[in-house]
Amino acid sequence: MCIRDRITRRDEGRLAEFDALFIRETTRLDHHTWRMARRAEHEGLVVIDDPQSILRCTNKVYLHALLRARGIPAPEGHLLNRSDLDRLDTLADTLTFPQVLKIPDGAFSRGVVKINSRAQLTEEARRLFEDSALLLLQEWMPTEYDWRIGILDGQVLFASRYYMARGHWQIYDHSGGRVRSGGFETMDPARAPEKVIKTALRATRLIGNGLYGVDLKQSGDRVVVIEVNDNPNLDVGVEDVVLGPALYRRIMAWFLEQMERKRQPRQVSTRQSPTS
């Protein structure tokens, strides 16, 4: 018998009552989602998003460095700290504008600024450094849409195109009184470019075996990973257009498999060590 219970952060003390925790809220390190994921893992629950995935995915600076170190294609970029303010003019001499400046833990296009000049680079860096010790400066890759590849335990669940908001360079436009977003297209993953799928799978292998949404840009034959999201959207009528209810059944089946695996007694070797 499967009992599902919708809980909130007020139920953190009850986590030991459950076998699994499925977090459906944007995660952050300084947040109850991080605390509850760690506590759930400590209590032996199956967890999505697990603490390791949250730690690796929510920090764009760390993720960029990880991707580059492991040979996963990512936009060209520079990691900046506050002491770099004095050398921004020198750095600007080596750049082609526009560039994109990001805080480590931005989400839904927040904390991401398009930089069009060296003067704006200095101005925006000073502003963002007021709240963040590190920033990521990356090349700007204009595209009509971003790919979002949904992956669970190394298997592709969905392939979507998220289009830029009308008249804006990002998927989400926060410039007005309300947030606007672009359209979408979800397709059978078999129809998505093989290079996009393979690159997304390579990226998630660096993170874990949980549920991820990999954002990629494609420009001609070039495919780069923008980020790996540990808490991807699963919206009715968007990401589930192809699989329908089977999308959610596959996720629940993964939880069940992991829970049953945890319940299996560990086999203790009965082999005796050879005597001398």
Regions found by a protein language model. Give the residues of each.
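Conserved N-proximal alpha/beta basic substrate-recognition cap immediately N-terminal to
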Residues: R4-E76
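A short beta-strand motif that forms the metal-chelation/ATP-contact edge
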Residues: F18-I23, I149-L152, L216, R222-V236
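A long amphipathic alpha-helix within ATP-dependent nucleotide-binding catalytic cores
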Residues: I171-R222, A246-P265
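Rossmann-like NAD(P)H-binding beta-loop-alpha module
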Residues: P75-P98
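Protein kinase-like catalytic core scaffold
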Residues: Q99, L157-F158, Y212, V224-E227
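Phosphate-binding site of ATP-dependent enzymes
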Residues: V113-T204
